[in-house]
Amino acid sequence: MTKHFTQIRDLGYQAAWDVLRRAKEMKDSRHRSTLLEGKSAIMLFEKASTRTRVSFETAVHQLGGKTIFMTPAESQLGRSEPLRDTARVLSRYNDLMIVRTFGQEKIDELVEYGSIPVINALTDEGHPCQVMSDMLTIYERTPDLEKVRVAWVGDGNNMANSWIEAAIFFKFELFMAFPEGYEPDRNLLALAMQAGAKIFLTHDPAMAVDGAHYVNTDVWASMGQEEEQKKREKAFAGFCVDDALMAKAAPDARFMHCLPAHRGEEVTEDVFESPASIVWDQAENRLHMQKALIEWVMEG
Protein backbone atom coordinates (compact mmCIF):
# COMPACT_ATOMS: atom_id res chain seq x y z
CA MET A 1 0.00 0.00 0.00
CA THR A 2 1.35 3.43 -0.97
CA LYS A 3 2.11 5.69 1.99
CA HIS A 4 1.73 9.45 1.97
CA PHE A 5 2.62 12.29 4.31
CA THR A 6 -0.09 14.90 3.80
CA GLN A 7 -0.45 15.93 7.44
CA ILE A 8 1.09 14.89 10.76
CA ARG A 9 -1.98 12.78 11.54
CA ASP A 10 -0.98 10.44 8.69
CA LEU A 11 1.85 9.10 10.84
CA GLY A 12 -0.02 7.85 13.88
CA TYR A 13 1.54 7.77 17.33
CA GLN A 14 4.19 5.09 16.82
CA ALA A 15 5.36 6.26 13.40
CA ALA A 16 5.53 9.88 14.57
CA TRP A 17 8.00 8.88 17.27
CA ASP A 18 9.86 6.49 14.96
CA VAL A 19 10.35 9.23 12.36
CA LEU A 20 11.43 11.73 15.02
CA ARG A 21 14.08 9.38 16.41
CA ARG A 22 15.17 8.36 12.92
CA ALA A 23 15.67 12.00 11.92
CA LYS A 24 17.93 12.52 14.93
CA GLU A 25 19.92 9.39 14.01
CA MET A 26 20.31 10.67 10.46
CA LYS A 27 21.50 14.05 11.68
CA ASP A 28 23.95 12.61 14.19
CA SER A 29 25.48 10.27 11.59
CA ARG A 30 25.33 12.74 8.67
CA HIS A 31 23.38 9.98 6.95
CA ARG A 32 23.74 9.19 3.26
CA SER A 33 22.18 6.21 1.51
CA THR A 34 21.19 4.66 -1.83
CA LEU A 35 17.49 4.46 -0.89
CA LEU A 36 16.54 6.54 -3.95
CA GLU A 37 19.25 5.28 -6.31
CA GLY A 38 17.80 5.15 -9.81
CA LYS A 39 14.69 7.00 -8.64
CA SER A 40 13.36 10.50 -9.23
CA ALA A 41 11.24 12.89 -7.17
CA ILE A 42 8.96 15.35 -8.94
CA MET A 43 8.64 18.62 -7.03
CA LEU A 44 5.48 20.58 -7.84
CA PHE A 45 5.71 24.05 -6.29
CA GLU A 46 2.91 26.58 -6.78
CA LYS A 47 4.38 28.71 -3.97
CA ALA A 48 7.88 30.14 -4.10
CA SER A 49 10.36 28.75 -1.59
CA THR A 50 13.97 28.85 -0.44
CA ARG A 51 14.29 26.48 2.54
CA THR A 52 11.65 23.99 1.41
CA ARG A 53 13.04 23.61 -2.09
CA VAL A 54 16.72 23.46 -1.18
CA SER A 55 16.25 21.17 1.83
CA PHE A 56 14.13 18.71 -0.15
CA GLU A 57 16.43 18.70 -3.18
CA THR A 58 19.43 18.14 -0.91
CA ALA A 59 17.57 15.40 0.98
CA VAL A 60 16.73 13.53 -2.22
CA HIS A 61 20.32 13.85 -3.48
CA GLN A 62 21.75 12.59 -0.18
CA LEU A 63 19.47 9.55 -0.47
CA GLY A 64 20.82 8.81 -3.95
CA GLY A 65 17.95 10.18 -6.04
CA LYS A 66 17.35 12.96 -8.52
CA THR A 67 14.80 15.77 -8.51
CA ILE A 68 12.70 17.43 -11.20
CA PHE A 69 11.42 20.86 -10.16
CA MET A 70 8.31 22.34 -11.76
CA THR A 71 6.30 25.50 -11.21
CA PRO A 72 2.88 26.34 -12.74
CA ALA A 73 4.68 28.31 -15.46
CA GLU A 74 6.51 25.15 -16.49
CA SER A 75 3.57 22.73 -16.43
CA GLN A 76 -0.17 22.32 -16.94
CA LEU A 77 -0.65 22.46 -13.16
CA GLY A 78 -3.71 24.60 -12.50
CA ARG A 79 -4.31 25.28 -16.20
CA SER A 80 -6.35 23.37 -18.75
CA GLU A 81 -5.33 19.87 -17.68
CA PRO A 82 -7.26 18.41 -14.73
CA LEU A 83 -5.06 17.79 -11.71
CA ARG A 84 -6.11 14.15 -11.66
CA ASP A 85 -4.58 13.70 -15.12
CA THR A 86 -1.35 15.34 -13.97
CA ALA A 87 -1.25 12.94 -11.02
CA ARG A 88 -1.63 9.89 -13.25
CA VAL A 89 0.99 11.00 -15.77
CA LEU A 90 3.64 12.07 -13.26
CA SER A 91 3.20 8.79 -11.40
CA ARG A 92 4.26 6.94 -14.56
CA TYR A 93 7.53 8.90 -14.73
CA ASN A 94 8.54 9.33 -11.09
CA ASP A 95 8.80 7.55 -7.76
CA LEU A 96 7.93 10.34 -5.31
CA MET A 97 5.88 13.55 -5.44
CA ILE A 98 6.72 16.58 -3.24
CA VAL A 99 4.07 19.29 -3.43
CA ARG A 100 3.92 22.89 -2.17
CA THR A 101 0.59 24.44 -3.04
CA PHE A 102 -2.35 26.48 -1.79
CA GLY A 103 -5.35 24.26 -1.06
CA GLN A 104 -5.12 20.96 0.82
CA GLU A 105 -7.67 19.59 -1.63
CA LYS A 106 -4.97 19.58 -4.34
CA ILE A 107 -2.78 17.33 -2.20
CA ASP A 108 -5.76 15.05 -1.61
CA GLU A 109 -6.49 14.83 -5.33
CA LEU A 110 -2.89 13.96 -6.16
CA VAL A 111 -3.03 11.22 -3.53
CA GLU A 112 -6.32 9.88 -4.87
CA TYR A 113 -5.35 9.71 -8.53
CA GLY A 114 -1.60 9.21 -8.37
CA SER A 115 0.13 5.92 -7.62
CA ILE A 116 3.32 7.14 -5.91
CA PRO A 117 3.95 8.58 -2.42
CA VAL A 118 2.99 12.23 -1.96
CA ILE A 119 4.61 14.53 0.62
CA ASN A 120 2.93 17.79 1.59
CA ALA A 121 5.65 20.44 1.53
CA LEU A 122 3.11 23.14 2.52
CA THR A 123 -0.51 24.09 1.99
CA ASP A 124 -2.66 26.90 3.37
CA GLU A 125 -4.03 24.37 5.86
CA GLY A 126 -0.81 22.83 7.15
CA HIS A 127 2.98 22.82 7.16
CA PRO A 128 3.66 19.33 8.53
CA CYS A 129 7.29 18.98 7.39
CA GLN A 130 8.22 22.22 9.13
CA VAL A 131 6.56 21.33 12.41
CA MET A 132 8.03 17.82 12.43
CA SER A 133 11.41 19.49 11.89
CA ASP A 134 10.66 21.83 14.77
CA MET A 135 9.85 18.83 16.94
CA LEU A 136 13.34 17.51 16.13
CA THR A 137 14.81 20.87 17.18
CA ILE A 138 13.00 20.63 20.53
CA TYR A 139 13.68 16.90 20.98
CA GLU A 140 17.44 17.48 20.63
CA ARG A 141 17.33 19.78 23.64
CA THR A 142 14.49 18.29 25.68
CA PRO A 143 13.99 14.58 24.95
CA ASP A 144 11.20 14.26 27.54
CA LEU A 145 8.61 16.09 25.48
CA GLU A 146 5.84 15.64 28.04
CA LYS A 147 7.69 18.14 30.25
CA VAL A 148 7.85 20.75 27.50
CA ARG A 149 5.65 23.84 27.25
CA VAL A 150 5.43 25.40 23.78
CA ALA A 151 3.90 28.83 23.16
CA TRP A 152 2.45 29.93 19.85
CA VAL A 153 1.95 33.68 19.40
CA GLY A 154 0.27 35.03 16.29
CA ASP A 155 -1.90 33.80 13.45
CA GLY A 156 -4.02 30.65 13.46
CA ASN A 157 -2.44 29.68 10.17
CA ASN A 158 -1.06 26.50 8.61
CA MET A 159 1.80 26.41 11.11
CA ALA A 160 -0.60 26.70 14.04
CA ASN A 161 -2.70 23.86 12.62
CA SER A 162 0.31 21.57 12.32
CA TRP A 163 1.44 22.42 15.86
CA ILE A 164 -1.99 21.34 17.06
CA GLU A 165 -1.56 18.01 15.27
CA ALA A 166 1.91 17.54 16.74
CA ALA A 167 0.49 18.03 20.23
CA ILE A 168 -1.69 14.96 19.71
CA PHE A 169 1.26 12.58 19.43
CA PHE A 170 4.10 14.22 21.34
CA LYS A 171 2.10 15.20 24.46
CA PHE A 172 3.77 18.56 25.15
CA GLU A 173 1.71 21.46 26.50
CA LEU A 174 0.73 23.92 23.79
CA PHE A 175 -0.35 27.42 24.80
CA MET A 176 -1.62 29.47 21.86
CA ALA A 177 -2.43 33.19 21.66
CA PHE A 178 -4.31 34.69 18.71
CA PRO A 179 -6.06 37.99 18.03
CA GLU A 180 -9.83 37.64 17.96
CA GLY A 181 -10.95 36.37 14.58
CA TYR A 182 -7.62 34.73 13.76
CA GLU A 183 -8.02 31.44 15.61
CA PRO A 184 -7.02 28.09 14.04
CA ASP A 185 -9.33 25.44 12.58
CA ARG A 186 -12.06 24.67 15.14
CA ASN A 187 -12.68 21.15 13.88
CA LEU A 188 -8.98 20.33 14.16
CA LEU A 189 -8.89 21.76 17.67
CA ALA A 190 -11.86 19.63 18.68
CA LEU A 191 -10.23 16.53 17.21
CA ALA A 192 -6.98 17.22 19.06
CA MET A 193 -8.71 17.84 22.36
CA GLN A 194 -10.72 14.63 22.01
CA ALA A 195 -7.43 12.80 21.40
CA GLY A 196 -6.07 14.11 24.70
CA ALA A 197 -3.84 16.92 23.43
CA LYS A 198 -2.95 19.52 26.08
CA ILE A 199 -3.85 22.72 24.25
CA PHE A 200 -4.80 26.04 25.83
CA LEU A 201 -6.09 29.05 23.88
CA THR A 202 -6.06 32.73 24.81
CA HIS A 203 -6.11 36.19 23.24
CA ASP A 204 -3.33 37.32 25.60
CA PRO A 205 0.25 36.70 24.36
CA ALA A 206 1.70 37.18 27.86
CA MET A 207 -0.55 34.44 29.22
CA ALA A 208 0.51 32.03 26.46
CA VAL A 209 4.22 32.71 26.92
CA ASP A 210 4.20 32.55 30.73
CA GLY A 211 6.62 29.77 31.72
CA ALA A 212 7.06 28.51 28.15
CA HIS A 213 10.25 26.68 27.20
CA TYR A 214 9.85 27.41 23.47
CA VAL A 215 8.22 30.54 22.05
CA ASN A 216 7.02 30.27 18.45
CA THR A 217 5.69 32.79 15.99
CA ASP A 218 5.27 33.29 12.24
CA VAL A 219 4.57 36.09 9.80
CA TRP A 220 1.28 37.91 10.25
CA ALA A 221 0.38 37.76 6.55
CA SER A 222 1.22 34.50 4.81
CA MET A 223 1.89 34.07 1.11
CA GLY A 224 -1.28 34.98 -0.76
CA GLN A 225 -2.49 37.33 2.00
CA GLU A 226 -0.40 40.35 1.04
CA GLU A 227 -3.48 42.48 0.39
CA GLU A 228 -4.44 42.00 4.06
CA GLN A 229 -1.09 43.26 5.38
CA LYS A 230 -2.30 46.60 6.79
CA LYS A 231 -5.42 45.08 8.31
CA ARG A 232 -3.38 42.33 9.93
CA GLU A 233 -0.76 44.72 11.27
CA LYS A 234 -3.55 46.49 13.15
CA ALA A 235 -5.14 43.25 14.38
CA PHE A 236 -1.80 41.81 15.55
CA ALA A 237 -0.65 44.89 17.46
CA GLY A 238 0.66 43.61 20.79
CA PHE A 239 1.58 40.20 19.37
CA CYS A 240 5.21 41.01 18.52
CA VAL A 241 7.68 38.75 20.33
CA ASP A 242 10.02 41.23 22.01
CA ASP A 243 12.34 41.18 25.01
CA ALA A 244 9.49 42.00 27.39
CA LEU A 245 7.42 39.07 26.16
CA MET A 246 10.37 36.66 26.21
CA ALA A 247 11.05 37.72 29.81
CA LYS A 248 7.75 36.08 30.79
CA ALA A 249 8.91 32.71 29.44
CA ALA A 250 11.07 30.19 31.32
CA PRO A 251 14.59 31.45 32.18
CA ASP A 252 16.21 29.29 29.49
CA ALA A 253 13.41 29.72 26.92
CA ARG A 254 14.22 29.51 23.23
CA PHE A 255 12.75 31.53 20.37
CA MET A 256 11.55 29.70 17.24
CA HIS A 257 10.44 30.89 13.80
CA CYS A 258 9.91 28.84 10.62
CA LEU A 259 11.30 31.69 8.43
CA PRO A 260 11.30 33.91 6.54
CA ALA A 261 10.88 36.43 9.36
CA HIS A 262 9.66 40.00 9.12
CA ARG A 263 11.87 41.59 11.74
CA GLY A 264 10.12 44.45 13.46
CA GLU A 265 6.69 42.89 12.92
CA GLU A 266 6.10 39.49 14.54
CA VAL A 267 9.55 39.52 16.22
CA THR A 268 12.07 42.21 17.10
CA GLU A 269 15.59 42.25 15.72
CA ASP A 270 16.96 41.84 19.26
CA VAL A 271 15.03 38.64 19.96
CA PHE A 272 15.65 37.20 16.50
CA GLU A 273 19.42 37.68 16.82
CA SER A 274 19.62 36.81 20.52
CA PRO A 275 21.34 33.72 21.99
CA ALA A 276 17.84 32.41 22.74
CA SER A 277 17.06 32.17 19.02
CA ILE A 278 17.33 28.70 17.50
CA VAL A 279 15.94 29.54 14.08
CA TRP A 280 19.04 28.34 12.22
CA ASP A 281 18.85 24.94 13.91
CA GLN A 282 15.22 24.77 12.82
CA ALA A 283 16.23 25.54 9.25
CA GLU A 284 18.96 22.89 9.24
CA ASN A 285 16.66 20.28 10.70
CA ARG A 286 14.37 20.53 7.69
CA LEU A 287 17.00 18.50 5.82
CA HIS A 288 17.28 15.72 8.38
CA MET A 289 13.57 15.42 9.11
CA GLN A 290 12.66 15.37 5.44
CA LYS A 291 15.15 12.57 4.80
CA ALA A 292 13.42 10.59 7.55
CA LEU A 293 9.99 11.33 6.09
CA ILE A 294 11.11 10.34 2.60
CA GLU A 295 12.47 7.09 4.00
CA TRP A 296 9.17 6.47 5.80
CA VAL A 297 6.97 6.90 2.72
CA MET A 298 9.34 5.07 0.37
CA GLU A 299 9.74 1.99 2.52
CA GLY A 300 5.99 1.40 2.33
UniProtKB/Swiss-Prot annotation:
Its EC number is 2.1.3.3. Coiled coil: none annotated. GO terms for molecular function: amino acid binding; ornithine carbamoyltransferase activity. Pathway: Amino-acid biosynthesis; L-arginine biosynthesis; L-arginine from L-ornithine and carbamoyl phosphate: step 1/3. L-ornithine binds at N158, D218, S222, M223. It is an enzyme of class 2 (transferase). One of its GO terms (cellular component) is cytoplasm. Keywords: Amino-acid biosynthesis, Arginine biosynthesis, Cytoplasm, Transferase. Pfam families: OTCace, OTCace_N. GO terms for biological process: arginine biosynthetic process via ornithine; citrulline biosynthetic process; L-arginine biosynthetic process. InterPro entries: Asp/Orn_carbamoyltranf_P-bd, Asp/Orn_carbamoylTrfase, Asp/Orn_carbamoylTrfase_sf, Asp_carbamoyltransf_Asp/Orn-bd, Orn/put_carbamltrans, OTCase_ArgI. SUPFAM superfamilies: Aspartate/ornithine carbamoyltransferase. Its main location: cytoplasm. It is found in: Cytoplasm. It comes from the Bacteria. It catalyses: carbamoyl phosphate + L-ornithine = L-citrulline + phosphate + H(+). Carbamoyl phosphate binds at S49, T50, R51, T52, Q76, R100, H127, P128, C129, Q130, C258, L259, R286. PANTHER family: ORNITHINE CARBAMOYLTRANSFERASE, MITOCHONDRIAL, ORNITHINE TRANSCARBAMYLASE, MITOCHONDRIAL. Belongs to the aspartate/ornithine carbamoyltransferase superfamily. OTCase family. Reversibly catalyzes the transfer of the carbamoyl group from carbamoyl phosphate (CP) to the N(epsilon) atom of ornithine (ORN) to produce L-citrulline. This is Ornithine carbamoyltransferase. It comes from Oleidesulfovibrio alaskensis (strain ATCC BAA-1058 / DSM 17464 / G20).
